[in-house]
Amino acid sequence: MNLWYNKICIRSSFLLEIADAETVSDMKGQKKTNAARILDGLSISYELREFPVDLDDLSAVHAAEMLNMPVEQVFKTLVARTDKAGVVMACIPGAAELDLKALAKAAASKKAEMVHLKEVLALTGYQRGGCSPLGAKKEYPVFLDASAKAWDKIAVSAGRRGEQIVLAPADLERAVHATTAQLTR
């Protein structure tokens, strides 16, 4: 039985609505991510969606395909550094390109640049393909692309490769104190 595609809804009351009992026993040994624990602590409803990890393609576009969601609804989290705000996180649609000038402006800075991939784990505690705006090692400013408002729900990484959290954009904003701005070209 392929357990990867079973839909799991986790509510703040910690009740699991799961399709079958076999999935319950498989999930008991798996620890929740920091992202999920933060949402639980804030009583924010979300859906945890899992899919098989392809180490050759860790993109948000691939995640969207695996989740059968529009790529514009699956947001990737990018880590950048600005001259005034320091390290920041930008959540943008999976196939979009980050506009660094727009990010700098949103962060009240003059300049922004992407951090090197080798720095991401040390800065956030997350691996490439599993970087979440929730639960990083430090609390960095989070900027959410304005296109998120077009959706009732968006998906962001749960903090582990192959896991996405689906939640309302307003709930993500509240959880990470995000600033919404036009961040893409």
Show the residue positions of the predicted features.
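Extended, low-hydrophobicity, polar/charged segments
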Residues: 3-185
